Amino acid sequence: MKKEKVVLAYSGGLDTSVAIKWLMQKYSLDVITLTVDIGQGINLDEIKNKAENLGVEKAYVLDLKEEFVKDYIIPAIKSNAMYERVYPLATALSRPLIAKYLVKIAKENGAKYVAHGCTGKGNDQVRIDLGVKALAPDLEIIAPVREWNFSREEEIEYALENNIPIPVSRKSPYSIDENLWGRSIEGGILEDPWQEPPEDIYLWTRFENREPSYIEITFERGVPVELNGVRKDVVEIIEELNKIAGSYGIGRIDHIENRLVGIKSREIYEAPAAIVIIRAHEALEDMVLPRELAHYKKMLEDKYAELVYYGLWFDPFREALQAFMDKTQDRVTGKVKIKLLPWSFSIVGRESPYSLYDHGLATYDKGSTFSTESAVGFIKLFGLQNYLYALKGGNND
């Protein structure tokens, strides 16, 4: 009898390596793996070979860096997307892209199932499941880690018993997720929120530079297009900024996060490029957006980040918010100067042909063009409602 097929999102890590054998043994399925290159910086050929050696029917490896940046990271930059105003959503942004290609590969191969290695406590299970169901409601989803209830130690034992090579030891039980936009580290001592993270968990943010330096990022309609006066594609800009800012130790995040599933968790992230780009983008927006638009956009940015974090990328609400965000970027064009320091950075300059900053109006020096005479009438009209309220004794209640 012909076996049914399952397409597994495969990272080469502990959970998904064990999942290959588990899906074969538990469900008697032919396993097809999908590995996407979104800037992890790992040897994808080795991962493909590893999957094939574990007996999969096919092992797909797709370079999706350009699509990841164009369709997910750039919209997030335009939206200054930071969950709880801290986390730039590197992992969350990648999940709808993975879901999209799980569906695509499943349809191409006539697979009835898709599978992933997300845990039953995390957010990623929601993001992948919702993404798949939004695009292909008929596909069935298997989440082995959610079903088998292995502890980390039991999972390692299973791998050893089944001759599955794994990049995890009992001395280093960290779960790591990485892409162009950031790196997350979980597990082990990090689960104690009082304990300082060991220095050896950090790879992108090593403190190597002590002397201050300056960088300049040029944006066109909200998109970074130049770094230090040299035009580059966004992938290159992100890669270079991860190295440059990371060498100052910039981009570390140690955060108690409110997960979608209702628990609080201690999250460690590295995101040098994401933090610098978003802060520079915000600084440029401060210069070019009218006040009411700037203030309202800030409120919607929080909701946008929540929707992405919650796995609602394909939701009409997120898409409607994206249309708003895109419109706000019509004049977000200009240059931002950033000073890099050990462990920190500052926005120290910005310029734009659409700047609403007028030196003549803003200066307190002689030659100011601001009409102070107009201020009296403005104040009267602006405070008219409060004035009338006070006349009626409203403040005496």
Swiss-Prot record:
Similarity comment text for this entry: Belongs to the argininosuccinate synthase family. Type 1 subfamily.
Protein name: Argininosuccinate synthase
Provenance organism: Dictyoglomus thermophilum (strain ATCC 35947 / DSM 3960 / H-6-12)
Gene3D superfamilies tied to this protein: Argininosuccinate synthetase, chain A, domain 2, HUPs
GO cellular component: cytoplasm
A matching Pfam family: Arginosuc_syn_C
Positions contributing to L-aspartate binding: T119, N123, D124
Subunit structure: Homotetramer.
Location (main, coarse): cytoplasm
Molecular-function GO terms, alphabetical: argininosuccinate synthase activity; ATP binding
Keyword Cytoplasm among UniProt keywords: yes
Name of encoding gene: argG
Sites where the protein binds ATP: A9, Y10, S11, G12, G13, L14, D15, T16, S17, G117
GO biological process: argininosuccinate metabolic process; L-arginine biosynthetic process; urea cycle
Cellular compartments annotated: Cytoplasm
Binding site for L-citrulline: Y87, N123, R127, S175, S184, E257, Y269
Enzyme class name: ligase
SUPFAM superfamilies, per database record: Adenine nucleotide alpha hydrolases-like, Argininosuccinate synthetase, C-terminal domain
Pathway: Amino-acid biosynthesis; L-arginine biosynthesis; L-arginine from L-ornithine and carbamoyl phosphate: step 2/3
Catalytic activity: L-citrulline + L-aspartate + ATP = 2-(N(omega)-L-arginino)succinate + AMP + diphosphate + H(+)
Highest taxon in the source lineage: Bacteria
Alphabetical UniProt keywords: Amino-acid biosynthesis, Arginine biosynthesis, ATP-binding, Cytoplasm, Ligase, Nucleotide-binding
